[in-house]
Design a protein with these regions (language model features):
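Class I SAM-dependent methyltransferase SAM/SAH-binding core
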Residues: 77-124
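Conserved beta-strand signature within the Rossmann-like core of class I S-adenosyl-L-methionine
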Residues: 159-174
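Conserved class I S-adenosyl-L-methionine
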Residues: 58-68
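Class I SAM-dependent methyltransferase Rossmann-like catalytic core
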Residues: 8-55
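Glycine-rich SAM-binding Motif I of class I
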Residues: 70-74
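A short SAM/SAH-binding and catalytic strip from SAM-dependent methyltransferases
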Residues: 136-152
Length: 177
């Protein structure tokens, strides 16, 4: 007689697009995000962080003006910690409350006291204008949002030193690291 086995497929773990892994060196929580690694902006973010660290910097501020669920920003902050930054601040903004909720939930799983995050529901212009008084080291955005919108371009110039966007043919602008 054959045994019949049933499985509740709804109880199976679902793979997350971005998840927090185990505790890494120095007590940090390792963020692994295949979404972030495949983002066309990741190599520019990685290079900017490396250049800032190589220049002797120990603190870094990163702003993602259209962060979605926050995977790229959170991955950048984790990478900054792995590079040896000791004070890391990330600010993400997006117009979708649902995506900001996901970003906040992911950020809450990172328990490293050297990494501070803030996510808010805001449009790109509002988020960038909030950075004018204390410009970020790196601002991440989608160039398509700024195309043909001079107010976005001006806000980007004032919001950060290094601008990272997804237009491969366009050079990042702002002051060099």
């Amino acid at each position: 007689m054959k045994e019949h086995m049933t499985m509740n497929v709804h109880a199976l773990a679902r793979p997350a697009r971005s998840h927090i892994g185990g505790v890494g060196q120095g007590g940090t929580v390792a963020l692994r995000s295949s979404t972030a690694l495949h983002d066309p902006r990741w190599s520019k973010v990685e290079a900017a962080l490396s250049a800032l660290r190589a220049s002797g910097r120990h603190a870094v501020r990163v702003v993602d003006a259209q962060c979605g669920a926050g995977s790229l920003l959170l991955h950048a902050l984790h990478h900054a910690r792995a590079l040896g930054f000791t004070a890391i601040e990330g600010h993400g903004a997006d117009g979708s409350p649902a995506l900001i909720g996901r970003a906040r939930a992911a950020a809450n799983r990172c328990v490293d006291p050297a990494v501070g995050t803030q996510f808010e529901v805001a449009d790109m212009i509002t988020a960038l204008r909030a950075e004018h008084d204390l410009p970020a080291d790196i601002v991440i955005c989608h160039w398509s949002a700024a195309r043909n919108r001079p107010e976005v371009d001006v806000a980007l110039h004032c919001a950060g030193r290094i601008i990272v966007d997804d237009d491969a043919g366009r050079q990042s602008f702002g002051a060099a690291a």
